Amino acid sequence: MSNLMPSPDALECRADAASAPSVKAYRARSADLGGGFVVRRALPQTGRRLVGPWCFLDHFGPLSFHAGKPMDVAPHPHIGLQTVTWLVEGEALHKDSLGHEQLIRPGQLNLMTAGRGIAHSEETPPRNSRTLHGLQLWLALPDAHRCAAPSFHHHGSLPMVTFGTCRAMVVIGELDGVRSPAQTYSSTVGVELAADRDGHTAVPLAASFEHAILLLVGHVELDDRALAPGTLYYLGTGREQLSLRLRAGARLMLIGGEPFGERILMWWNFVARTPEEIAEARSDWEQDHRRFGDVRAYVGRRLPAPPLTLRPPRPR
């Protein structure tokens, strides 16, 4: 996904992990990605920029359509992050400047490492199920890896573990000794939880991580409180398990990680450390520098960068 605000501010993001278990609700805001494709942006927002290394979370759908392609995000650049694409329903087609063209379906993972620079697009493919529902998330890369060579990996199957009435698919990182095959560069976790039947579930957690959950489908209760759609629930640190009551068919996303120990600066689709790095990346994109390459398989124009005013970064 892309941040299409006409004049985005640079956001300064630092770890701000609660020192104990907590429950704080953050309502996602609407963001229009063009062509009427509206997402709910749960990260970053006022009061909560990071959950571990997770710095961005867009939730789109569920929607049904009869013609056309509701998702058509033209080529745009990234630096300093990994993108995680996860679908609940439907299909999406990834194309990038490394030459990859990859269809993704529910239960599969697209993981793109931007490193020093990459460009990609995301579209509804011509042959599709006329439905779309999913997430795109970003992981901030730590300083030692943020300027590495870009790469893309598709994982067609992922490991699963069962807790009570709930199936947990390990998308990113490790849960209860079960590890995703996806390569990441920080201590982190991303898991989709799905209930086969009504009941209570206790999911083991790493107490040193901070965590958050987002309802995707159905009815889920945390501490006898029903989770609201379109709301990110931040859970703090120090939890050894997550106790939930779910109705059959419910699904939610759990994300977390060690509090990210580096200050980052986010602007448009870039995760950097200084305003000068952002200005250089923007200039390279606008001048068609080989740093980002071309998404040759995409038919249409790429996204222009918004204007950049190097105001002092807006703290969290």
Go through the PLM ranges and name each one.
Residues M1-R316:
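Jelly-roll (double-stranded beta-helix
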